[in-house]
Swiss-Prot record:
<feature type="transmembrane region" description="Helical">
    <location>
        <begin position="20"/>
        <end position="42"/>
    </location>
</feature>
<dbReference type="InterPro" id="IPR048279">
    <property type="entry name" value="MdtK-like"/>
</dbReference>
<dbReference type="GO" id="GO:0006811">
    <property type="term" value="P:monoatomic ion transport"/>
</dbReference>
<feature type="transmembrane region" description="Helical">
    <location>
        <begin position="400"/>
        <end position="422"/>
    </location>
</feature>
<dbReference type="Pfam" id="PF01554">
    <property type="entry name" value="MatE"/>
</dbReference>
<keyword id="KW-0406">Ion transport</keyword>
<comment type="similarity">
    <text>Belongs to the multi antimicrobial extrusion (MATE) (TC 2.A.66.1) family.</text>
</comment>
<feature type="transmembrane region" description="Helical">
    <location>
        <begin position="282"/>
        <end position="304"/>
    </location>
</feature>
<feature type="transmembrane region" description="Helical">
    <location>
        <begin position="250"/>
        <end position="272"/>
    </location>
</feature>
<feature type="transmembrane region" description="Helical">
    <location>
        <begin position="325"/>
        <end position="347"/>
    </location>
</feature>
<dbReference type="GO" id="GO:0005886">
    <property type="term" value="C:plasma membrane"/>
</dbReference>
<keyword id="KW-0813">Transport</keyword>
<feature type="transmembrane region" description="Helical">
    <location>
        <begin position="137"/>
        <end position="159"/>
    </location>
</feature>
<keyword id="KW-0997">Cell inner membrane</keyword>
<dbReference type="InterPro" id="IPR002528">
    <property type="entry name" value="MATE_fam"/>
</dbReference>
<feature type="transmembrane region" description="Helical">
    <location>
        <begin position="166"/>
        <end position="188"/>
    </location>
</feature>
<keyword id="KW-0812">Transmembrane</keyword>
């Protein structure tokens, strides 16, 4: 390929990745905003309600994110079918329908566990009063799981067709619905009973149902999606495609669960160190979570772009799609890392009154954690981008093993050893997380570089 032609191909791919990735990033941030609005309303109920909601949310997240990873198989399977062309409409329809089946199937045991949330929290030695409140909250919030997983399936479908803007607009509308629902149900406005923490859970469930119904409306009414007839005979079982879906999705779900639960475990370690450490950790992890949404959205775009090229059997395009996404993601995280190093006080001030002398210790600790998080950003971005690129090649089992090794085999033990044995305390916990993420990032990128040698490109 002539140099000018190659340069033009790279520019086109970079533009396509950005056009797909930006709406996905914004959709992820909008979904985070729903959680933030819940915290704001619950905070007005008092510190005990806030603590109970945090307990419940941690359990909900651990269970929900396995399902999130499971239904994430939708994007690479749909993208591969579209790239391969052939009988793409039928293949896409089969995959999306079985994605919706998977959302329902997983939600049954997931909701059953959440229904018994109080018993689970008591079993891990949480305070009985907080466990009771968290249990009631979870019995309301659990109804958000089925529509949320269904929304993710349909969002993956429209993203694979490279039309992600509708999902972002629906997510914005869901934020408004969530705020209104909290105002009505938490405090008892417009004649509704004041349900407090339970009302916040119900508001989230209703807003999430709105997310799903909005996406159903889009795929049924928009002519670009309507031709796939996703909901015709949706209850007809397709056991072969369902098995293929779970074969690809189960390792994604496990890897996602490994990552989410290590952060939950890190919070427990911080709790053992003391209240200031836990408060500073909560602030730093919230900042890191916001910036993580950028490479996470770009990684979702990478799965689609790589998946299209993989289905079309275009190895050069596979490389371009992967490296363009990687460059965009790492570039964004480098900017985030610089901001954490140069202006930590500005970032912390969004969550804490840094002028209050009573907050001086938390400010000092949060600033120290953000210094470690600057490195954390680069490797966290690299691992999620690597996972997204490999996912486009339908490579999920080995990345799952990398995640288990890096997070639980190295990251958490390193963090505990540095915190308690070496005396680094909270900085040790964060350093352990960074070490684990760095190992996963190196392993993911090494596998991507060896994709042809290990036979990933020959499976299309």
């Amino acid at each position: 390929m002539p140099r000018s032609t190659a340069r033009a191909a790279w520019k086109r791919e970079l533009a396509a990745t950005l056009a797909l990735g930006l709406p996905l990033v914004l959709t992820n941030l909008a979904q985070m905003a729903m959680t933030v609005t819940d915290v704001i309303f619950i905070g007005r109920l008092g510190s005990q309600a806030l603590a109970a909601s945090a307990l419940g949310a941690n359990l909900f997240t651990a269970i929900e994110f396995f399902g999130l990873g499971l239904v994430a198989a939708t994007a690479p399977m749909v993208a591969h079918a579209l790239g391969r062309r052939g009988n793409a409409v039928r293949d896409v329809r089969r995959t999306v329908r079985q994605g919706l089946w998977t959302a329902v199937i997983y939600s049954v045991p997931g909701c059953l566990l959440l229904w018994h949330g109080e018993a689970i929290l008591l079993a891990i030695d949480q305070p009985p009063e907080l466990a009771a409140q968290a249990g009631a909250y979870l019995r309301a919030l659990m109804w958000a799981m089925p529509p949320f997983l269904g929304f993710l399936v349909l969002r993956s479908f429209v993203a694979a067709l490279q039309r992600p803007r509708s999902a972002f607009l629906i997510a914005l509308a869901a934020i408004v619905l969530n705020v209104f629902g909290n105002w009505v149900l938490v405090f008892g406005n417009l004649g509704a009973p004041a349900l407090g923490l339970v009302g916040a859970g119900l508001a989230s469930a209703l807003a999430t149902l709105g997310l799903f119904l909005g996406m159903v409306g889009v795929v049924c009414l928009d002519r670009r999606f309507r031709r796939y007839h996703l909901f015709g005979d949706v209850w007809q079982p397709d056991w072969q495609r369902l098995a293929e879906f779970w074969k690809l999705g189960l390792p994604i779900g496990a890897a996602t669960a490994f990552e989410v639960t290590i952060f939950n475990a890190a919070a427990f370690l911080m709790g053992w160190l003391g209240e200031p450490e836990l408060a500073a950790h909560a602030i730093a992890i919230q900042i890191a979570s916001v910036t993580f949404m950028i490479p996470y959205g770009i990684a979702q775009a990478a799965t689609v772009r790589v998946g299209h090229a993989y289905g079309a059997r275009q190895p050069d395009q596979v490389a371009r799609a992967g490296w363009c996404a990687f460059s965009l993601g790492i570039g964004s995280m480098a900017i985030a890392a610089a901001l954490m190093l140069l202006a930590p006080g500005l970032l912390v001030s969004a969550f804490l009154d840094i002028g209050d002398p009573a907050n001086a210790q938390v400010l000092r600790l949060a600033t120290a954690y953000l210094a470690v998080a600057a490195l954390f950003q680069i490797v966290d971005g690299a691992q999620v981008l690597g996972a997204g690129m490999l996912r486009g090649l339908h490579d999920t089992r080995v990345p799952m093993l990398y995640a288990a090794l890096g997070y639980w085999g190295v990251g958490l033990p390193s963090g505990a050893a540095l915190a308690f044995w070496a005396g680094w305390r909270g900085v040790g916990v964060w350093s352990g997380l960074a070490i684990g993420l760095a190992l996963v990032a190196v392993l993911m990128m090494q596998r991507w570089l060896r994709r042809d040698r290990v036979g990933l490109l020959r499976r299309a």
